[in-house]
Regions:
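N-terminal helix-turn-helix
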Residues: 34-65
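Short, flexible coil/turn micro-motifs enriched in small/turn-prone residues
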Residues: 21, 26, 57, 65-66
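Extreme N-terminal segment that seeds HTH/winged-HTH DNA-binding domains in transcriptional regulators
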Residues: 1-33, 39, 84-87, 91-95
């Protein structure tokens, strides 16, 4: 899955949305360790600080958990992931 960035909206919000899609689709399953900020930023072609901002927002939303010694993982709360999946489906239907 490639990264799609457009100029119309803040990059970090687009990265956050794309990470959510990767989590709910199972690309990054529940409990899985995510690649490093630097690796994700390199893959997306963005500044690591921008990627960090997107990932911090995922932490705040409860979709990821950061552990200082072992990095960042997807939440094991499958209910939270399912809620996000339903939100995405609802937004698609509204369009």
């Amino acid at each position: 899955m490639g990264w799609k960035i457009d100029d119309g909206r803040p990059i970090w919000t687009q990265l956050k949305e794309q990470m959510i899609k990767r989590i709910v689709s199972g690309t990054y399953p529940s409990g899985e360790k995510l690649p490093s900020v630097r690796d994700l930023a390199g893959e997306a072609g963005v500044n690591p600080n921008t990627m960090q901002r997107a990932l911090s927002a995922l932490d705040q939303d409860g979709l990821t958990i950061t552990n200082r010694t072992s990095g960042r993982c997807v939440t094991e709360d499958v209910t939270k992931i399912e809620e996000c999946r339903k939100d995405i489906a609802h937004k698609i239907v509204k369009q």
